[in-house]
A protein has these predicted regions:
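Helix N-cap/capping motif at the beta->alpha junctions
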Residues: 36-45, 66
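Active-site residues of response regulator receiver
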Residues: 58, 88
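Short amphipathic alpha-helix used as the core "switch/output" element in two-component signaling
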Residues: 45, 67-80
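Alpha4 helix (beta4-alpha4-beta5 surface) of REC/receiver domains from two-component response regulators
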Residues: 23, 68, 91-106
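Receiver (REC) domain active-site loop signature in two-component systems and cognate sites
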Residues: 61
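C-terminal output helix
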Residues: 94, 112-121
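Active-site beta3 strand of CheY-like receiver
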Residues: 50-56
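Two-component/phosphorelay signaling modules centered on CheY-like receiver
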Residues: 16-35
């Protein structure tokens, strides 16, 4: 499925370089409606206030990590079905199991490239239609 330019995506990572790389990758795909947050707490506020189609969030962040954000999103009635891709620098099984139990739609191990991100997004968004 082609990704629509009108997709509204929230990128959550405490590292500006990762947010910038992810933004550039999304822009190469033609996606222009991109929000950013530095931590889970900030992201939760954005997700509640802004209509979104997808959250792409890092796991390790201060204040509220990606798993905490995922649980908060799944626990909030208005946004609980929002598609969620978790980014991690670790591909450990325990994290993957915890994320799956919390309701993650997909995960991606950093570093990643354009093709892998696109594939994960298409899988997640295609499953939502």
């Amino acid at each position: 499925m082609p990704l629509a330019a009108s997709l509204k995506v929230l990128i959550v990572d405490d590292q500006m370089s990762v947010r910038q790389f992810t933004r550039m990758t999304l822009e190469k795909m033609g996606i222009r409606l991109i929000h950013e947050a530095e931590n889970g707490q900030e992201a939760l506020g954005t997700a509640i206030a802004q209509p979104l189609d997808l959250i792409i969030s890092d796991f390790n962040m201060p204040e509220m990590d990606g798993l905490g954000l995922l649980r908060a999103v799944r626990g909030h009635q208005a946004i609980r079905k929002l598609p969620f891709i978790l980014l991690t620098g670790r591909g450990d099984r325990e994290l993957v199991v915890k994320a799956a139990q919390a309701g993650v739609n997909n995960y991606l191990v950093k570093p990643f490239n354009d093709a892998i991100l696109r594939q994960k997004m298409e899988q997640v968004l295609g499953a939502m239609t």
